[in-house]
A protein has these predicted regions:
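Active-site beta->alpha loop and helix N-cap motifs at the rims of alpha/beta catalytic domains
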Residues: 1-7, 11-144
Length: 145
């Protein structure tokens, strides 16, 4: 269990718009060195929806390769596409991440409770991982739920 502040990591990009992994690792290490107990890669300020799934997979692996313990990470895995959300979630859990943070469907506003339940049921069935812990990402002011 992670106790304490869990912070998203800013996602830095190079001039050519490619992902800057070395700076990403430095930012993560700086957050931990300055009191964060855990990290939420691809959280709010992490530009999750601006980064392709394969690039996110490489970035998460890059954090681990730099020496960051995956058990203190709860990466944002939610995307508009449930198939990519499942793939990213499985990858994070296979790496040993503490859990995953995901969004409810957000494109169409006013989804019914039954619709939300069905979405998360399909997501959980699709991930089908023994160490699955889902942290729901809920921004009241942004998602209008």
């Amino acid at each position: 269990m992670i106790k304490g502040l869990i912070s998203p990591i800013l996602s830095p990009f190079n001039e050519d718009l490619s992902f800057n992994q070395s700076l990403y690792n430095e930012l993560a290490e700086d957050l931990l060195a300055n009191g964060c107990a855990g990290l939420a890669p691809f959280g709010t300020t992490g530009e999750a929806l601006s980064i392709g799934n394969e690039e996110r997979i490489r970035a998460l692996q890059g954090l681990i390769d730099s020496g960051i313990d995956p058990s203190i990470m709860i990466p944002g895995t939610g995307l508009c596409n449930i198939t990519d959300t499942i793939k990213m979630s499985k990858h994070a859990l296979d790496l040993g991440c503490h859990g995953i943070m995901t969004l409810p469907p957000f494109y169409f506003k006013g989804m019914s409770d039954e619709g939300l339940f069905n979405y998360f049921e399909k997501l959980i069935e699709g991930i089908n991982h023994q160490s699955l812990k889902i942290y729901l990402y809920h921004l009241q002011y942004d998602l209008n739920f």
